[in-house]
Structure formats: structure tokens, C-alpha cells
Amino acid sequence: MSYKCSRCKRDVELDEYGGVRCPYCGHRVLLKERSRDVKEVSVQ
């Protein structure tokens, strides 16, 4: 799963048992990346 650190803005890959912490700066707030899929919605 891909996350982005809220402090240093780097992409972080987390393992299941690695803990929730940025390996670069040690910050504990990680933001989940949004999917890049485009969704179509029909409007009536």
C-alpha cells in the first residue's frame, strides 16, 4: 500500500508489521494516496 508522509512529502511503502512511521523523517502521520482511476457517473 502506498502512502505519503505529511511532513517530508515522500512516498512510503508500508509492510504489514513494519509499524506506521516514515522511514525518512520518523513522522507518524501518513496520508493514503488516492487512486488515479477516472470514474464515470451518469447524470439525469
Swiss-Prot record:
Zn(2+) binds at C8, C22, C25. Its main location: cytoplasm. The keyword Transferase applies. This is DNA-directed RNA polymerase subunit Rpo12. One of its GO terms (biological process) is DNA-templated transcription. It comes from the Archaea. One of its GO terms (molecular function) is zinc ion binding. It catalyses: RNA(n) + a ribonucleoside 5'-triphosphate = RNA(n+1) + diphosphate. It is found in: Cytoplasm. It comes from Halobacterium salinarum (strain ATCC 700922 / JCM 11081 / NRC-1) (Halobacterium halobium). Signal peptide: none annotated. InterPro entries: RNAP_P/RPABC4 (IPR006591), RPABC4/Spt4 (IPR029040), Rpo12 (IPR023464). Keywords: Cytoplasm, DNA-directed RNA polymerase, Metal-binding, Nucleotidyltransferase, Transcription, Transferase, Zinc. Gene3D superfamilies: RNA polymerase ii, chain L. DNA-dependent RNA polymerase (RNAP) catalyzes the transcription of DNA into RNA using the four ribonucleoside triphosphates as substrates. The keyword Secreted does not apply.
